[in-house]
């Protein structure tokens, strides 16, 4: 007696058991009605329930395979035919199917029916799910069990019970191998259809899923279950095929399935996911494929076809060109809801809004200074490492920031494209122009949290905060004197080197600081009284002793 006949008999007995009174109760209630609760292991040992022995294993089967078969797990092999059984009545036979003896009493029949009901609610093996699960039993599983078994089926054999299969569909796919209608194979299918059994070959299953348009997901599942199959035109491993070398190239099963199953007027896609075209396109290389749609991209992808009409800069995407044009038109469609500042890009607005929240999640591990942006932290860390990745191509001077390099290159070209519309002053950077325009508007958006003084530039606020903290981070390497501003250190170092870069255009006198030059120029332009006051101030400065180094 085969496992299929035993499963059918169990299904028939289960249908008769449903007609008995009390079948609508749960498994626990049925067992409690018949002499109390019976453990599952003892129930299988009932004298009126006999276990059908398994078929003997063929010769050549390993001990590991036999052990897996004893546990109810049968490994699937490539090239074998698997049976998807839709049994009537929702029966769920296992490798060892309980078969009711004809002399069994009604009580034992009720117990067996209850056990069969409990069987459908118990965790079952992959053998049961893959080969003997009916549609009715599949519908009884909850969402978690369906997801679990669907994942198992996808990993093990590529089968999925989520597709609404129909007998004519499979019959049409199985047929077409050169067999005439009414052949012995078709008659065998009709006999198995009476029992609810449909026999499907794995290769035919691959072709059917490919015809359904699910070749992408099926290929990924079959690749995980049986190892990645060779791609189109790819040679198989030397140990997999013992035939001649000319037969090593394996055709693509998905492409063949599409050619066989598609109508004559259907335009098939040129490429499939994971299947590269055998002949490259124009240009010598195959075009890349889209991972989302499975369609080949345009051969022109990667080229910068969108060109700016004003500056000639080219872009690969039209959206990038639209964003770039805003640098010429000055359009800033993204406005900050807190301060009203506008930006040309939404990413710049997001970065700006962190200033209002005061959040500084990025901390330097060397000095523990915090920053609101990760890019600012990276630029700051170059101060500790001394890294200067940006090099001027004309004078080989290096910079830690790209913006500093752009500013420096303006000294070579002399180009100042950013012009102030009020006074006509030009600048090399747009940020410098924005800072300059605050001198006309009087806007000072950076207030000091200690004294409330406002500044037009953030750098001036940082320097001002040192007057409250007393911090002097700039040290002279010659005398050790410290300063709160880098400009003060630069002017001080000129006293050691004797450099006086500021000269008076009238008398030629030189000075080490620009402020001293401005004071000197008033001597030539001021009246006698102002000149006397300047001379007295200069004499007092010369008579005063130099400040002691700190």
Curated annotation (Swiss-Prot):
**Subcellular location, in the record's words?**
Nucleus
- Region annotation Disordered: residue ranges? 1-67, 174-200, 216-296
KRAB domain: which residues? 124-193
Zn finger (C2H2-type) start-end: 306-328, 334-356, 362-384, 390-412, 418-440, 446-468, 474-496, 502-524
The record's section on InterPro entries has: KRAB, KRAB_dom_sf, Zinc_finger, Znf_C2H2_sf, Znf_C2H2_type
| Biased composition regions of type Basic and acidic residues, renumbered to the chain | 11-22, 45-58, 187-200, 267-281
Which molecular-function annotation in GO is an example for this chain?
A: DNA-binding transcription factor activity, RNA polymerase II-specific
Q: What GO terms in the biological process aspect are recorded for it?
A: regulation of transcription by RNA polymerase II
Question: What are the entry keywords?
Answer: DNA-binding, Isopeptide bond, Metal-binding, Nucleus, Phosphoprotein, Repeat, Transcription, Transcription regulation, Ubl conjugation, Zinc, Zinc-finger
Write out the similarity annotation.
Answer: Belongs to the krueppel C2H2-type zinc-finger protein family.
Q: What is this protein called?
A: Transcriptional repressor RHIT
Question: Species name for this entry?
Answer: Bos taurus (Bovine)
Q: What is the lineage of its organism?
A: Eukaryota, Metazoa, Chordata, Craniata, Vertebrata
